[in-house]
Amino acid sequence: MDQKQIEEIVRSVMASMGQTAPAPSEAKCATTTCAAPVTSESCALDLGSAEAKVWIGVENPHRADVLTELRRSTVARVCTGRAGPRPRTLALLRFLADHSRSKDTVLKEVPEEWVKAQGLLEVRSEISDKNLYLTRPDMGRRLCAEAVEALKAQCVANPDVQVVISDGLSTDAITVNYEEILPPLMAGLKQAGLKVGTPFFVRYGRVKIEDQIGEILGAKVVILLVGERPGLGQSESLSCYAVYSPRMATTVEADRTCISNIHQGGTPPVEAAAVIVDLAKRMLEQKASGINMTR
């Protein structure tokens, strides 16, 4: 699917919702509007600021304009310079800060108050705490007994599409992107004339947990929005795993269709919502997902 097709899908879904699609320039990475690059090194500089992110550590460059353009075009660690064989102090501090941020988002919990504020039903996997979640991924693939009963009692049965949200390995991915992806996604699915299930939140969930959810609720398509494993400097990336007619015993990873890198610096959440709506419609038409779908 090329950029033009994606933009058409976004316009179509947003139009059906009575909203205006964002201009292409608004969907670009925030780095294009960062502050001008600086070369001075200061311990007082906020390591998370835009100024620190576009800092250039190369001293006396031959073509400063080339470095400036390169630094503005990517969030990668380029143009940081060296102090002999070692990285410069600010470059090292930024590396450590980004590493710390990535660890924090893995270990943080999605606040119960936040889940309640969104009006979501909360269930959990067989995992009871974050440490167990990180060491026993197999238990994160199954719902606890209480969760199974809650879904049977409180969720719509036999939906065309069931949307599930889970913390995964990034709490920030859920809390930061939720408002921009779930409302347009739910509205787009309903505008498409599909029977949409009750969205809910799964604490300590792994990707394969959507198979059990689909089996319990009798959903034709299950869409799981889950926090991605964070990278250095990027802890807000969300993934969508969609699968047609999942079954615990027979569904394999090749049966899933994945849309990753959903965040403001990657695929904008509102754009991803439109693409997911189109994907769900095609899955229902073809009665397939993953490698079994035709382009």
UniProtKB/Swiss-Prot annotation:
Keywords: Bacterial microcompartment, Cobalamin, Cobalt, Lyase. GO terms for biological process: amino acid metabolic process; ethanolamine catabolic process. Pfam families: EutC. Pathway: Amine and polyamine degradation; ethanolamine degradation. It catalyses: ethanolamine = acetaldehyde + NH4(+). GO terms for cellular component: ethanolamine ammonia-lyase complex; ethanolamine degradation polyhedral organelle. Disulfide bonds: none annotated. One of its GO terms (molecular function) is ethanolamine ammonia-lyase activity. This is Ethanolamine ammonia-lyase small subunit. The lineage of its organism: Bacteria, Pseudomonadati, Pseudomonadota, Gammaproteobacteria, Enterobacterales.
